[in-house]
């Protein structure tokens, strides 16, 4: 029964992977450009990443949802899999690690697209609660400004956690640096969780340094 279940899993995965690959592969950097990006590579997996600190460039990409004026750093990430097995990346555990000259280190968690949109819409923090205008039990009106920005950010974000065999995925991660972009030059992108599926074989962490970039 176990071999049959594994076959069914692989068959289902084969149907899903092309969609994930196509969704984020079209806009990925060309091979030569990708090779020039800061990267870490082992076990047949290459993680390339580039922090975007130029506000005018960010505005060209994100439009009115430009994260930089709100103190949020967008990081372009390309994940390439040169093996014959799919690899799963733990998106929820990715951090931007800040390495201070004193030796202290801080980890900044990545924001979801919804969290990033909220910070961009309200860079000074959420508005103070207002008096309820609707009867209890009725759904409140959503944050229209944040939702509008989310429509821009979501398709650009790194939202697939599966890197298909011999495939590439590409997108942006967002980190709230509270307007201190000087931290970028002493930071690195840290990806602690990656594994080969369906064997669930863990891979050593990936770390891409942005020092002096």
Describe each region flagged by the PLM.
Residues 1-7:
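Positively charged n-region of N-terminal signal peptides that target proteins for export
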Residues 7-18:
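Bacterial N-terminal signal peptides
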Residues 19-23:
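Sec/Tat signal peptide C-region and signal peptidase I cleavage site
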Residues 24-213:
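Conserved functional micro-motifs across diverse proteins
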């Amino acid at each position: 029964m176990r071999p049959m279940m594994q076959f069914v899993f692989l068959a289902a995965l084969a149907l899903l992977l092309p969609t994930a690959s196509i969704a984020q592969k079209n806009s990925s950097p060309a091979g030569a450009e990708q090779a020039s990006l800061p990267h870490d590579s082992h076990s047949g997996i290459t993680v390339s990443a580039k922090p975007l600190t130029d506000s005018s460039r960010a505005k060209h990409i994100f439009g009115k949802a430009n994260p930089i004026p709100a103190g949020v750093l967008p990081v372009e990430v390309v994940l390439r899999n040169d093996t014959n097995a799919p690899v799963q990346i733990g998106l929820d555990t990715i951090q931007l690690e800040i390495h201070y000259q004193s030796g202290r280190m801080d980890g900044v968690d990545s924001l979801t697209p919804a969290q990033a949109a909220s910070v961009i819409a309200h860079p000074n923090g959420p508005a103070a609660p207002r008096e309820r205008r609707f009867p209890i039990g009725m759904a409140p009106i959503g944050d229209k400004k944040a939702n509008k920005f989310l429509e821009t950010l979501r398709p650009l974000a790194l939202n697939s956690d599966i890197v298909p065999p011999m495939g590439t995925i590409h997108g942006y991660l967002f980190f709230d640096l509270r307007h201190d972009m000087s931290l970028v030059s002493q930071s690195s992108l840290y990806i602690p969780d990656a594994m080969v599926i369906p064997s669930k074989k863990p891979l050593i962490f990936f770390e891409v340094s942005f020092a002096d970039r």
